[in-house]
């Protein structure tokens, strides 16, 4: 079967955060093919999370050669499920902590190139640092660079 994309993206989070991020991303850049979400709800146990993560991964793998999973928190259930899945596969990379600036840059780069995951992630720290600003009424501000 011919792969249509190099990198599938899976957003995973506690609650609806991942769906909100996807909706906002689509407002900015348009349709995001090969991007799925897994929301963890209070009624789910660890096995439920693992099953949903694996099902989303398998859907992405039908079209994509690699899968990039973004999770909201390092020690959260979505991250634990993603890391467990990653440990059993060779084609998964997990990134913990994501925001809209990161998603816009990476999805745009993914959509306009044939990069592999490691190439796509080069410079992600700079994007993250430059997207953080602390501003005051007095005009003082901090940026991560």
Regions found by a protein language model. Name each.
Residues 2-145:
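N-terminal loops that bind phosphate or other acidic moieties
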């Amino acid at each position: 079967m011919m792969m249509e994309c190099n990198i599938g993206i899976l957003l995973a989070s506690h609650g609806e955060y991942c769906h909100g991020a996807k909706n906002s991303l689509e407002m900015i850049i348009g349709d995001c093919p090969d991007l799925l979400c897994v929301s963890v709800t209070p009624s789910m146990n660890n096995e439920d999370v693992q099953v949903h993560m694996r099902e989303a991964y398998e859907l992405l793998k039908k079209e994509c050669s690699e899968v990039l999973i973004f999770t909201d928190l390092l020690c959260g259930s979505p991250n634990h499920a993603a890391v467990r899945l990653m440990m059993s596969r060779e084609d998964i990379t997990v990134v913990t902590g994501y925001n809209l600036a990161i998603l816009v840059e990476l999805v745009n780069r993914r959509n306009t190139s044939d990069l592999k995951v490691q190439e796509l992630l080069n410079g992600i720290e700079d994007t993250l640092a430059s997207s953080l600003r602390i501003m005051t009424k007095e005009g003082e501000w901090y940026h991560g660079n």
